[in-house]
């Protein structure tokens, strides 16, 4: 029954002529994959991927003579702003302590941090990997509460999370939103970003991260002035759950708001 009905809809092929179930299976299993979300595991994947991507970028920068660790200012201090993939607004702030430590652990300034929160836990000091990971989580939280880290976030990350905090959880395009948020915030505050370097970190499927950098062109003000991002976010219209589900399932027959300036 079901096998024949399925085969009827398949295009003509050798597989169809020979019988798609000719390998002996008598039962047809119909199923679908459902994602299982584990927040803590997901955050750990993000954190490790970002740290590895930053390490790889540093090694590549040294190999290409872009960066000399003995002579140059550390990379995260060279970047005027750091633009991150933000599935939620404070992801970068919460996930960046590892990179912050990694980039500074050889500096004199890091000794001041260690005098405040202690040295990093060593895996060899713990009986199990779980105990060490728990201690490391506590150490990252301690880093995030230091004045040096909080100032670092304020200077380089905070502006990128403003738009995300107004929108809520999102995934696709979040790095671009963080970039727009940063530029518009700096435009409104009349900051000078001409020719400065941004560090950027993308993240996506398969827990893969990519760190790269970009130089801001002097025309950035002209472009950012046209966005009106925060003004547009203020003009949003709230919808109820029924309307949301109709939109999500593609059941809505009419636009919720009057289309204006649409591309299609």
Regions found by a protein language model. Name each.
Residues 67-98, 126-132:
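Conserved beta-ketoacyl condensing-enzyme motif
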Residues 90-92, 205-210:
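Flexible loop/turn segments at secondary-structure boundaries
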Residues 96-102, 214-218:
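Short secondary-structure boundary/capping segments
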Residues 1-56, 61-64, 112, 207-264:
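Condensing-enzyme catalytic core mediating Claisen C-C bond formation in acyl metabolism
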Residues 34-42, 80-83, 157-170, 174, ...:
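Cysteine-centered functional microenvironments
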Residues 53-78, 97-101, 113, 182-190:
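Phosphate/pyrophosphate-binding loops at sites that engage ATP/ADP/AMP, CoA/4′-phosphopantetheine
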Residues 67, 84, 105-113, 121-158, ...:
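Hard-cation-handling environments
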Residues 119-147, 165, 173-179, 183, ...:
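Non-catalytic terminal extensions of PLP-dependent enzymes
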């Amino acid at each position: 029954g079901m096998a024949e009905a399925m085969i009827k809809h398949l295009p003509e092929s050798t597989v169809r002529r020979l019988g798609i179930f000719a390998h002996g299976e008598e039962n047809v299993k119909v199923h679908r994959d459902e994602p299982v979300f584990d927040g803590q595991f997901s955050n750990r994947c993000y954190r490790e991927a970002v740290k590895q991507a930053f390490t790889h970028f540093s090694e590549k920068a040294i190999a290409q003579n872009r960066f000399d660790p003995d002579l140059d200012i550390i990379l995260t201090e060279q970047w005027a702003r750091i633009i991150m993939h933000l599935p939620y607004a404070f992801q970068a702030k919460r996930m960046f302590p590892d990179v912050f430590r990694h980039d500074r652990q050889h500096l004199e300034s890091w000794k001041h941090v260690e005098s405040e929160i202690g040295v990093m836990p060593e895996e060899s000091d713990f009986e199990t990997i779980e105990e060490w990971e728990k201690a490391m989580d506590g150490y990252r939280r301690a880093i995030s509460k230091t004045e040096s880290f909080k100032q670092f976030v304020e200077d380089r990350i905070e502006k990128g999370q403003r738009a995300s905090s107004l929108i809520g959880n999102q995934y696709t395009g979040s790095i671009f939103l963080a970039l727009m948020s940063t530029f518009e915030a700096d435009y409104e505050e009349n900051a000078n970003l001409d020719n400065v370097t941004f560090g950027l970190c993308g993240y996506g499927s398969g827990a893969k991260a990519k760190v790269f950098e970009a130089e801001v062109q002097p025309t950035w003000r002209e472009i950012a002035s046209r966005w009106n991002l925060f003004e547009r976010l203020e003009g949003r219209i709230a919808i109820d759950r029924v309307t949301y589900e109709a939109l999500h399932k593609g059941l809505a027959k009419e636009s919720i708001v009057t289309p204006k300036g649409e591309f299609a």
